[in-house]
Each structure stands twice: as C-alpha cells, then as structure tokens.
UniProtKB/Swiss-Prot annotation:
<feature type="binding site">
    <location>
        <position position="168"/>
    </location>
    <ligand>
        <name>UDP-N-acetyl-alpha-D-glucosamine</name>
    </ligand>
</feature>
<dbReference type="InterPro" id="IPR025877">
    <property type="entry name" value="MobA-like_NTP_Trfase"/>
</dbReference>
<keyword id="KW-0961">Cell wall biogenesis/degradation</keyword>
<dbReference type="InterPro" id="IPR001451">
    <property type="entry name" value="Hexapep"/>
</dbReference>
<feature type="binding site">
    <location>
        <position position="25"/>
    </location>
    <ligand>
        <name>UDP-N-acetyl-alpha-D-glucosamine</name>
    </ligand>
</feature>
<feature type="binding site">
    <location>
        <position position="314"/>
    </location>
    <ligand>
        <name>UDP-N-acetyl-alpha-D-glucosamine</name>
    </ligand>
</feature>
<dbReference type="GO" id="GO:0000902">
    <property type="term" value="P:cell morphogenesis"/>
</dbReference>
<keyword id="KW-0479">Metal-binding</keyword>
<feature type="binding site">
    <location>
        <position position="106"/>
    </location>
    <ligand>
        <name>Mg(2+)</name>
    </ligand>
</feature>
<keyword id="KW-0460">Magnesium</keyword>
<dbReference type="Pfam" id="PF14602">
    <property type="entry name" value="Hexapep_2"/>
</dbReference>
<feature type="binding site">
    <location>
        <position position="421"/>
    </location>
    <ligand>
        <name>acetyl-CoA</name>
    </ligand>
</feature>
<keyword id="KW-0963">Cytoplasm</keyword>
<dbReference type="GO" id="GO:0009252">
    <property type="term" value="P:peptidoglycan biosynthetic process"/>
</dbReference>
<protein>
    <recommendedName>
        <fullName>Bifunctional protein GlmU</fullName>
        <ecNumber>2.7.7.23</ecNumber>
        <ecNumber>2.3.1.157</ecNumber>
    </recommendedName>
</protein>
<dbReference type="GO" id="GO:0003977">
    <property type="term" value="F:UDP-N-acetylglucosamine diphosphorylase activity"/>
</dbReference>
<dbReference type="Pfam" id="PF12804">
    <property type="entry name" value="NTP_transf_3"/>
</dbReference>
Length: 430
C-alpha cells in the first residue's frame, strides 16, 4: 500500500559555471520566479509533509527568506548521490513508508501531475524514474530491458548507441526505507570522485528490486545548464501559460506577445491585448481588459475594469470594478474605486481614490518629500482638473472639484471648489 505522506528532496547545490553568472544557477528566473521557486511551488501543489532543499554553503544565506522549507547543507559538493545521502541522514525521523520525491532545482517545469503519476506507479516497486524522448544525444539514458528499467548510463556509456532512447529527466520517487538503503550503497566514482544518484538503479536491480519508469514530454523535462537552456525553458513556460489561460476562457489577442509570471491569475472573459507583461502578484478578475503595452505587477484588477494602453500598475494596487486607467498612467501602492477614470498622463502614488471620480490629464500625486512618502485621499464623485499637483499628505473630500492647473497643499472640504493658481494677466503686445 502506497503511503499518503510524502517529502520532497530538492537538489540545489552547485553554482552552475556554464551560466557564466555571479548568481547561483537555481536562482535564475523563468516567468519572474527563480527555478528553485518553480520546483517548490509545484511541490506545494501536492501538500507534502516536508520540502527539504539540499544546498551548499554559499547558497544557504540567499535561501533563508524562503518559507516553509527545510534547508540541508551539503558541506562538500560530492555529487547528487552524496546530496541525497546527506538529505536522508537529516531526515532520519521520516517513516520508512513515507514517499520521497527527489527532484533537481534546475529542472523547473516538471508538473505536479507528472509527480502524482510517478507516485501512483510506485506500487510494488522500489523506485520509479522519469524519462523523456529527445533528439539531444548528450542526456543520460534509461536502459530498458523487457519493460523494466535496468540502469541509467551516460550517453558515452551507451554500448548500443541507440538512435531512439529515453533520456533521464533526473526525477526519482521511492519509499524512504528503500531510498535510505540504496543511497548508502553508492560508491565513489574513481575518475570524478563523486557519488552519482543514478547508480541506485543498477544497485536496486542487483538487489532483485523492481524499478519502474514513467515517460513525460521533452519540454517539461527541460534541464537548464546555460543561458540558451534558460531561453528555451522561458519559451516553453510562456507557451504553456498561454494555453492554460486560453483554455480557461481568457482571450489573448496576440498570445505570442503576452508574457506571464508563475503566479499570474486571470479569470475568464478577460481580454488581454498585445504586448502586455505580467510581473509577480497579478490577479485579473472576469471581464477586465488589459490594453497594449501595459506592465502590471503586484496588483488586483477587478471585474470589467480597463487598463491601458501604455499603463504601469504596481505596488499592491487595486483597480476597482469598471474603473478605467488610461494611456501613460502609473498607479503605485494605491486603491482606485469603482467607475473612477484616470485616463491620461498621470501619476497616482500612495493614494486612495473613491468611486465615480475623474482625475484629469497630467494630474500628479506628489507623495515623496525627499525622505518619506505620504498618503493622499480623494473621495467619491470628485473632479480633479487637468495638470493639477496634489501635495501629500492631503485629503480631498467627496464631491469636491479641483480647478485645472492647481497646486493643492491644503485639505479640501466636502462639496468645495479649490483653486490654487496665479491669476491670468493678459497684456497687449506693442
């Protein structure tokens, strides 16, 4: 009987020299999130008992901000076998029957559904591995005999040099008892002085244990070793996201020009126009329209709102139902009420704008005094004339009007007209 509890062991040590970067490989981003965040995010979809990440010392400080994971330090980077051995020694209290999923931090596109399939296939087996078909002959290979996995070898060690083969995706699933016993039997490779996790397949077979395998698509199994691999993975990620959204009822007018983050949420009947970028933390409710060349991050766009073109929204901003945020408008750390219009050339920062208000073209909320940021509150049914500067901290109460061209430095009472500009002087030219 397969255990219902499982633990993820994610291998993330090693810098990744082929990336040619000061940043550790697993922290390079796809869809605005690091590779490691992708792996952790997908693991959490399965509600595991524990997520353990094996890292080397240089990486551990960078990962302390990660929540709900256990960091295990691999003192010396002696290969994947040593990494899993180190993890299992740190997880000694894990029940023998608990399922352990071993995954690489640089293989970020593996779906939780694929892991579920591997877990379900574990019944009656000591170990289940993941393979995929590819024309790239550099991958390690799964050697299959009579329907059973016999060993995993490097491409150069494939004696038969098969034209068609299953490549090794690197993901393994086993019960804790078997994994503990098998990794302890891995011997150090005499030429590289490392311990290879893939050796446990042949070790299991020699112990008369059954080893199974599951096949997935090559795009999902993409491993990342260099910048070109990163480009491919980003492409596959975006293509998959576009399909997910269109299948769920979102209209993408030109899908190939729209870019998403891992956590982007868009409800059905929304329309996304060309050249829109979604950063982290964006949620779009049903019926909203995002017009071309808009850049959104950390914001909520409510039902039937319209944003863009050429709009930037960020900083935990909420745009209310049926509100319109127009061209060349930036809204940051603000709340915009239902049916409010901010249509042209404006900056709204650290502000709350009520319902049914109109913010005229060229309005600037001056929220920063050089040291600190201050709040501005604009009530409902207000009209702010064009080219107005609102100097925070400031309160403009309901149903008030700000005359065009004003510089407002004092609070404006309810149902009031505020004018703050020089009187026009007109003289005849001689």
């Amino acid at each position: 009987m397969i255990s219902k509890t499982h633990t993820f062991v994610i291998l993330a040590s090693g810098h990744g020299r082929r990336m040619n970067s000061d940043l550790p490989k697993v922290l390079h981003k796809i869809g605005s999130f690091s590779m490691l965040q992708h792996v952790i995010y997908n693991a959490k979809q399965l509600n595991p008992e524990n997520i353990a990440v094996v890292v080397d010392q240089p990486l551990i400080e960078r990962l302390k901000c990660f929540k709900d994971i256990q960091l295990i330090t691999q003192e010396l980077t002696l290969g994947t076998g040593d990494a899993v051995k180190t993890a299992m020694r740190n997880l000694r209290e894990l029940p023998d029957s608990s399922i352990v999923v071993v995954q690489y931090g640089d293989t970020p596109l593996i779906k939780s559904s694929t892991i579920t399939k591997m877990i379900s296939y574990l019944e009656g087996k000591a170990l289940v591995c993941l393979g995929f078909r590819t024309s790239n002959k550099e991958y390690g290979r799964l050697i299959i005999e009579n329907g059973s996995l016999r060993e995993i070898v490097e491409a150069k060690s494939d004696k038969n040099n098969h034209e068609e083969f299953l490549a090794n995706a690197g993901i393994m699933v086993a019960c804790a008892k078997n994994l503990r016993e098998l990794v302890e039997k891995i011997e150090c490779n005499s030429s590289t002085h490392e311990y290879y996790l893939t050796d446990i397949v042949s070790i299991a077979v020699k112990s008369n244990l059954n080893v199974g395998y599951v096949i997935t698509g090559g795009e999902e199994a993409t491993g990342i070793n260099n910048r070109n691999d990163l480009i491919k993975a980003e492409f596959y990620f975006q293509e998959n996201k576009r399909k997910i959204f269109t299948d769920s009822g979102v209209t993408l007018v030109a899908p190939e020009t729209v870019f998403f983050s891992l956590d982007t949420q868009i409800a059905r009947d929304s329309v996304i126009y060309p050249y829109v970028f979604f950063g982290t933390g964006v949620k779009i409710e049903s019926g909203a329209k995002i017009l071309p060349f808009s850049h959104l991050e950390n914001c909520l766009i409510k039902s039937n709102a319209e944003v863009g073109p050429f709009t930037r929204i960020r900083g935990n901003t909420t745009i209310g139902n049926k509100a319109k945020i127009g061209n060349f408008v930036e809204v940051k750390t603000s709340e915009v009420g239902q049916n409010t219009r901010i249509k042209h050339l404006s900056y709204i920062g650290n502000a709350k704008v009520g319902q049914e208000s109109n913010i005229g073209a060229g309005t600037i909320v001056c929220n920063y005094d050089g040291k600190n940021k201050h709040e501005t509150n604009i009530g409902s049914n207000c009209f702010v004339g064009a080219n107005s500067s609102l100097i925070a901290p400031l309160n403009i109460h309901d149903e008030s009007v700000i005359a065009a061209g004003s510089v407002i430095v004092e609070d404006v009472p309810e149902k009031s007209l505020a004018i703050a500009r020089e009187k026009q002087v007109t003289k005849r030219i001689k």
